[in-house]
């Protein structure tokens, strides 16, 4: 669904128009890549209410798949709600590669709450996929390491310092940017119409910039703050 560029929050009117009897799941990513937006408890409650109403209308579960690799990387006291508290039919996908600053290490978990419809079948499907897709099996050593680091995070204060420096610098130069509440990206609007040309020129200055068109939001570019 096209993002709301004004604040990168859910456009509930547009969402309801797109839900139909064929909808099996809705995917949310909060804290969000690339905008850094975080969905509040109020937002998740409203989304859950809509999905429950649609489940009753269509007579089948609509799963809310919550992609949460940046769960711990939030700023200024922002809280990330625990989605299963608001919608039973939830599946959570998590990765330690972000919380432990291990980019490229694809190790994490999929949570299927017991309250989810057909939870045993979902669990079996997740396990089966992990066995069948051998290239996604996490190395046994890193499984042991991750278990011992489960309650640890990288230094979030460093990310916040970088966010503030980049946000203040870009906005002082005239860029419009929604201040991220989480993750480690900024998603400012470029000062020209061609986001790809802007990204190419940025390479000359050793800047890591991704065109917004790759995220369905042209005329915006993603900046990495790490």
Task: Please tell me what each predicted stretch does.
Residues 1-226:
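PLP-dependent class I/II
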């Amino acid at each position: 669904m096209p993002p709301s560029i004004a604040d990168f929050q859910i456009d509930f009117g547009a969402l309801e128009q797109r839900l139909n009897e064929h909808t099996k799941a809705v995917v949310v990513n909060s804290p969000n890549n690339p905008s850094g937006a975080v969905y509040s408890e109020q937002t998740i409650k409203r989304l859950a209410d809509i999905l429950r109403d649609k489940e009753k209308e269509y007579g089948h579960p609509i799963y809310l798949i919550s992609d949460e690799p940046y769960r711990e990387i939030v700023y200024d006291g922002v809280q990330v709600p625990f989605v299963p508290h608001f919608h039973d039919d939830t599946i959570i996908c998590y990765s330690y590669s972000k919380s432990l600053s291990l980019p490229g290490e694809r190790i994490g978990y999929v949570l299927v709450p017991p309250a989810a419809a057909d939870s045993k079948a979902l669990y079996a499907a997740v396990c089966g996929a992990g066995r069948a897709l051998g290239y996604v099996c996490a190395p046994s050593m890193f499984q042991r390491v991750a278990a011992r680091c489960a309650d640890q995070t990288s230094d979030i204060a460093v990310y916040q310092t970088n966010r503030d420096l980049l946000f203040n610098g870009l906005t002082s130069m005239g860029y419009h940017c929604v201040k991220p509440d989480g993750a480690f990206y900024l998603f400012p609007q470029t000062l020209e119409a061609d986001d790809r040309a802007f990204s190419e020129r940025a390479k000359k200055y050793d800047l890591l910039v991704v065109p917004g068109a790759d995220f369905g939001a042209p005329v915006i570019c993603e900046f990495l703050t790490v």
